[in-house]
A protein has these predicted regions:
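NAD(P)-binding Rossmann-fold cofactor-contacting core
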Residues: 1-15
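Small-residue helix-packing motif on alpha-helices
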Residues: 8, 26, 116-119, 174
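Aromatic/hydrophobic pocket-lining residues that form π-stacking "cages" and hydrophobic walls in ligand
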Residues: 8, 77, 160
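Helix C-cap/helix->beta junction micro-motif
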Residues: 15, 83-84, 167
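Rossmann-fold NAD(P) dinucleotide-binding segment
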Residues: 19, 23-87
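Rossmann-fold dinucleotide-binding core
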Residues: 37, 68-147
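Helical "substrate-binding/catalytic lid" subdomain
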Residues: 118, 138-187
Length: 187
């Protein structure tokens, strides 16, 4: 299932499988459902309601959400899952497109330990580190820590470049040199 039918068709053509008309249809019979959408509202739209994934999931199934969303929506959907006899793990990722393509994402998880332990080996197919940080919402909060750290790195690089330019340095040369030392960052 994809909210954009053309994307689902392309994926099915390339990798095989069947296209589901709704999240509910896609989730029917699955022990673990993985999802990654744009934001809180998108997440609610694919999870809740008569055609949402929760409606099609069997008791004790796990919804493993890789969306970068709010900790509040993670807690909300965790509670909604519990009411239905399901499990919800908030599991935002870090590593960018290259990490996703190469199975090297870092996955920061929030939720209950038992369903996490069941889902972790499956998530290792796309993650090099899949870690339970704490209760529901903790994965989203850890992702916020990650984003704050990245912003600090980008800000520091900007300040360094500004300083170097003001000092009259050849910044192409400086960046090439510091890129081989402790200032190296894949970002």
């Amino acid at each position: 299932y994809n909210r954009t039918l053309k994307k689902a068709e392309r994926w099915a053509d390339e990798y095989g499988g069947r296209i589901a008309a709704t999240p509910r249809e896609a989730a029917e019979g699955a022990q673990i459902v993985f999802a990654c959408v744009g934001n809180d509202d998108d997440l609610r739209s694919v999870v809740l309601g008569a055609d949402g994934a929760f409606a099609g999931m069997a008791k004790e199934a796990i919804f493993f959400d890789n969306t970068t969303a709010s900790a509040e929506v993670a807690r909300e959907l965790h509670a909604a899952a519990r009411e239905r006899g399901l499990h919800f793990i908030d599991a935002p990722v870090s590593g960018g497109q290259a990490g996703a393509v190469n199975g090297l994402l870092t996955v920061m998880c929030g939720g209950d330990a038992e369903p996490f332990a069941r889902a972790q080996p499956v998530a290792m197919a796309f993650g090099r580190a899949v870690t339970l940080i704490g209760p529901s919402g903790a994965g989203q909060l850890a992702k916020m820590v990650n984003q704050i750290a990245i912003v600090g790195l980008v800000q520091g690089l900007s300040e360094g470049i500004s300083f170097g330019l003001a000092a009259g340095l050849d910044m192409k040369l400086v960046l090439a040199v510091i890129g081989k030392g402790a200032a190296q960052s894949w970002q």
